[in-house]
Amino acid sequence: MVMTDPIADFLTRVRNANTVYHDKVEAPASNVKKAIAEILKQEGYIKDYESVEDGKQGIIRLYLKYGANKQRVITGLKRISKPGLRVYAKKDQIPRVLGGLGIAIVSTSKGIMTDKQARQSGLGGEVICYVW
């Protein structure tokens, strides 16, 4: 079966694993997914991630993070720009997620970055997803 939106599949795997309190989640690797995982790690939403070579595409493995009493660190993940409806934002129209409590992951001409980094760099781009 051909996957039409690999990023949405990746986010859904993370969301589902987070819902049932799994310690780790695996997905087929790509450079975009690695960049998203790096942002999630920098922002403190996951413990760590690693890329595992399997002779084909490779696998990206994320180690999920939970607070005291199994409180989820990631409370929500939402795909914004989809293959059927791309969503772009100019540098002065980059959205704030929950008034700054969450992050928007934006694909810019300088790479994939958070909404805050894009605002500081004065760059717009495709809004990939929201994380809160």
UniProtKB/Swiss-Prot annotation:
One of its GO terms (biological process) is translation. PROSITE patterns: RIBOSOMAL_S8. NCBIfam families: PRK00136.1 (NF001109). This is Small ribosomal subunit protein uS8. The keyword Ribosomal protein applies. One of its GO terms (cellular component) is ribonucleoprotein complex. Transmembrane segments: none annotated. It holds the Pfam family Ribosomal_S8. SUPFAM superfamilies: Ribosomal protein S8 (SSF56047). It comes from the Bacteria. Belongs to the universal ribosomal protein uS8 family. It comes from Desulforamulus reducens (strain ATCC BAA-1160 / DSM 100696 / MI-1) (Desulfotomaculum reducens). The keyword rRNA-binding applies. One of the primary rRNA binding proteins, it binds directly to 16S rRNA central domain where it helps coordinate assembly of the platform of the 30S subunit. GO terms for molecular function: rRNA binding; structural constituent of ribosome. Part of the 30S ribosomal subunit. Contacts proteins S5 and S12. Keywords: Ribonucleoprotein, Ribosomal protein, RNA-binding, rRNA-binding.
